[in-house]
Amino acid sequence: MSFPGVVESRTFSLPVNNIDTDQIIPGQFLTTTQREGLGKFCFYSWRFDENGDARPDNPLQAFDASSQQVLVAGSNFGCGSSREHAPWALLDFGFRAVISSQFADIFRSNSLKNGLLPVMVEDHVVEFLLAHPNHPVKIDIGSSMLTVEGFGEFGFPLDSFSAYCLTRGIDQLDFLLKNETAINRYEQGSKTP
């Protein structure tokens, strides 16, 4: 799935620091390698009790994927074990991007490779968004800018290769396969006699 060059959405706030990958998708749901269908397990332990009954008081029960495609969370988002299932679950649940002041390195890498945009900004931006749930934002991949309505514009780190892959819905392997002919031609031309 490709990420559009610009996403305009309202935010969904989770004012929690250190949300780890086991909270995003618990280990018992990691038995598949299919990306689709994992949204129902996203934040499962927060949304459902030990009997599988919905926790009606949990704010995630009110999440609206049609208008809230951007998750805002506390710092150190995605810490814990490395699992590609975490960005898969977030994407399948309906999020296109996550805004935080800090991401675990492996989670950030897995997200970029799987089409989920991690938007890392300064604490005061996250604090504003957490204090103003359901706030309109615009994320522009081309300029690596987050626009927070009524608050300002803020740059975020995004390398050009990741931006290229995100906007085309490809990963690193897809990129290599797409350019296989050019790579082979280069290798043939650079061989020493």
Across the structure, where does each feature detected by a protein language model lie?
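Short hydrophobic-aromatic micro-motifs
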Residues: 13, 72, 155-156
